[in-house]
């Protein structure tokens, strides 16, 4: 696949992830869009294949961190925050046992 297509794919992945991660938060959506666009514009004239591949890898890593690590919270009172996790971040709850298992 051409380098140009790889760059475009990472750009689109970042934009889609931004829309999912910061859903219903207009300020964060706009800030993320501006930052993504700024970084891609800043490196628009890069010609070194090695540097481009490194930046593609960095963009993919950033997208993964956003998708897997960022949680939305909103202020609902003076000292209260409402956590709004996405379904992809929820893990299966495994019961905790205080006693060690008996060997059979």
Curated annotation (Swiss-Prot):
The keyword Signal does not apply. Pfam families: Complex1_LYR. It is found in: Mitochondrion matrix. GO terms for cellular component: mitochondrial matrix. The keyword Chaperone applies. It comes from the Eukaryota. GO terms for biological process: mitochondrial respiratory chain complex III assembly. Keywords: Chaperone, Mitochondrion. Coiled coil: none annotated. GO terms for molecular function: protein folding chaperone. Assembly factor required for Rieske Fe-S protein UQCRFS1 incorporation into the cytochrome b-c1 (CIII) complex. Functions as a chaperone, binding to this subunit within the mitochondrial matrix and stabilizing it prior to its translocation and insertion into the late CIII dimeric intermediate within the mitochondrial inner membrane. Interacts with UQCRFS1. Belongs to the complex I LYR family. PANTHER family: COMPLEX III ASSEMBLY FACTOR LYRM7. This is Complex III assembly factor LYRM7. The lineage of its organism: Eukaryota, Metazoa, Chordata, Craniata, Vertebrata.
